[in-house]
Regions:
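An N-terminal assembly and electron-transfer interface module characteristic of large anaerobic redox
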Residues: 1-180
Length: 180
């Protein structure tokens, strides 16, 4: 007969019952691979140069689209790494406000990383509306920080100007793909 604990329902583990060896898949790891496991063009194949894309805010979800877009145009895509303390510290000098959210503060370090890589230009658009995933969704807009933080970067990361790195930061709407 099964012994049961009211709070955990795991009392039988101490009775020698075998542990389930088929753990649930790590969905975070799965998503990271689906979003970022793309092979960039080689330097020889990239006839138009290199574009840097920061792995930040809305660019996480939109990266497959932008990677494909720039690759088809003949650019080698350079993606900033996953966020770390070292990445955060790279951009600390250009953060203009203590009150902005931490994910936005991380953007500065990702931009600095891409500058250090010597890319031809950095692409970081302001995306007001994302693609509508469901007709039943009430909205598909980004928060004001996500939608406009590219302007903050343009105006506060002085290394962009000092190192003569072109910074492309158009405002786009992904809810009507034909407008891109």
């Amino acid at each position: 007969q099964r012994q049961m604990c009211k709070e955990t329902d795991r009392c039988e583990r101490g009775l020698g019952k075998e542990k389930n060896e088929n753990p649930a898949p790590n969905l975070y790891e799965y998503k990271r691979h689906r979003l970022f496991d793309y092979e960039p063009l080689t330097a020889e194949q990239a006839t138009r140069g290199t574009v840097g894309i920061p792995r930040v805010l809305n660019m996480w979800e939109d990266y497959p689209f932008w990677f494909t877009f720039f690759t088809k145009l003949g650019y080698r895509v350079v993606l900033s790494p996953y966020s770390t303390k070292a990445i955060f510290e790279k951009g600390m000098e250009s953060i203009p406000s203590e009150s902005v959210c931490y994910p936005a503060k991380l953007v500065h370090g990702h931009i600095m990383y891409l500058i250090e890589q010597g890319v031809d230009f950095i692409f970081y658009p302001g995306i007001v509306y994302e693609r509508r995933d469901s007709a039943a969704a009430d909205n598909n807009y980004n928060c004001p920080i996500v939608a406009s933080y590219n302007e903050n970067i343009k105006n506060n990361v002085e290394d962009l100007k000092e190192k003569n790195i072109k910074f492309m930061n158009p405002f786009l709407s992904l809810d009507k793909i034909e407008t891109i």
